[in-house]
């Protein structure tokens, strides 16, 4: 049985004070919550501090990016082994903001996926379509192409112990969200697409929804059979709002 995972992507937000206060708030809010995995991905500069603040809790540490290179003359980059060394477990790759602003290709993201698997880390592979692609009816084709970059190079087995986050780009930070039925349809397509190569692996892949999840829509989203939690942006910067989403996932999947 799949256990849901709710992960907070802090993006380019934070300070030493915020790290301390937000994690203290999360530990308090989530102390009695069971049945849902929880992770946070602060900016890289705060990973060590966050790891210390998370000690003894059930909240896992994540990161927002990784480089394809293992070491060497690559100024400004962070390697998979460095992330592992500092205590990170879940690593976000393929986020639409990196695909857009840093021109990261499907093939480049697949390389990151492989580097993370080799290091024993868990990729959180973000896929999803833009508003124009959505309106053109290309949602499934775009998601398939982004998945195939990994499937065709690393095989379906690479998706063992992996997270996929479906993030309709048109719903990120816009306040828009896919309806639960719309999101479920895409999540089922993603699972079925992986299942074409390996049904057993597809069944255990955690597929998160990542399009403006908030306290108001979380419960209804999580009742869908193929939505296994969420990758949360803005709401992850407030302990109470994030906790509501985690609790909704735990409650929805408990049955």
Swiss-Prot record:
It catalyses: D-glyceraldehyde 3-phosphate = dihydroxyacetone phosphate. Its EC number is 5.3.1.1. One of its GO terms (cellular component) is cytosol. Its main location: cytoplasm. CDD domains: TIM. Keywords: Cytoplasm, Gluconeogenesis, Glycolysis, Isomerase. GO terms for biological process: gluconeogenesis; glyceraldehyde-3-phosphate biosynthetic process; glycerol catabolic process; glycolytic process. It is found in: Cytoplasm. It is an enzyme of class 5 (isomerase). One of its GO terms (molecular function) is triose-phosphate isomerase activity. Substrate binds at residues 9-11, 173, 212, 233-234. Pfam families: TIM. The active site is at 95 (electrophile), 167 (proton acceptor). Pathway: Carbohydrate biosynthesis; gluconeogenesis; Carbohydrate degradation; glycolysis; D-glyceraldehyde 3-phosphate from glycerone phosphate: step 1/1. InterPro entries: Aldolase_TIM (IPR013785), TIM_sf (IPR035990), TrioseP_Isoase_bac/euk (IPR022896), Triosephosphate_isomerase (IPR000652), Triosephosphate_isomerase_AS (IPR020861). Belongs to the triosephosphate isomerase family. Homodimer. Involved in the gluconeogenesis. Catalyzes stereospecifically the conversion of dihydroxyacetone phosphate (DHAP) to D-glyceraldehyde-3-phosphate (G3P). HAMAP family: TIM_B. This is Triosephosphate isomerase.
């Amino acid at each position: 049985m799949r256990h849901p995972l709710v992960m907070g992507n802090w993006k380019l937000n934070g300070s030493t004070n915020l790290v301390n206060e937000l994690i203290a708030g999360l530990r308090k809010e989530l102390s009695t919550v069971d049945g849902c995995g929880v992770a946070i991905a602060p900016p890289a500069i705060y990973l060590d501090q966050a790891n210390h603040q998370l000690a003894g809790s059930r909240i896992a540490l994540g990161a927002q990016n990784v480089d394809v290179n293992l070491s060497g003359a690559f100024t400004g980059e962070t390697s998979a082994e460095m992330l592992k060394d500092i205590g990170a477990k879940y690593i976000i790759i393929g986020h639409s903001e990196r695909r857009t602003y840093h021109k990261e290709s499907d093939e480049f993201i697949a390389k990151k996926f492989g580097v993370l698997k080799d290091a024993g880390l868990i990729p959180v592979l973000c896929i999803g379509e833009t508003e124009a692609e959505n309106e053109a009816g290309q949602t499934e084709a775009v998601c398939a192409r982004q998945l195939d970059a990994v499937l065709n190079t690393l095989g379906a087995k690479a998706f063992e112990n992996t997270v996929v986050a479906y993030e309709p780009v048109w719903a990120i930070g816009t306040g828009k969200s896919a309806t639960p039925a719309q999101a479920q349809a895409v999540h089922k397509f993603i699972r079925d697409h992986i299942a074409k190569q390996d049904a057993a692996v597809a069944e255990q892949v955690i597929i998160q929804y990542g399009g403006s999840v908030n306290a108001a829509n979380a419960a209804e989203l999580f009742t869908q059979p193929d939505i296994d939690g969420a990758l949360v942006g803005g709401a992850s910067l407030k302990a109470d709002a994030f906790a509501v989403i985690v609790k909704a996932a735990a409650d929805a999947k408990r049955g």
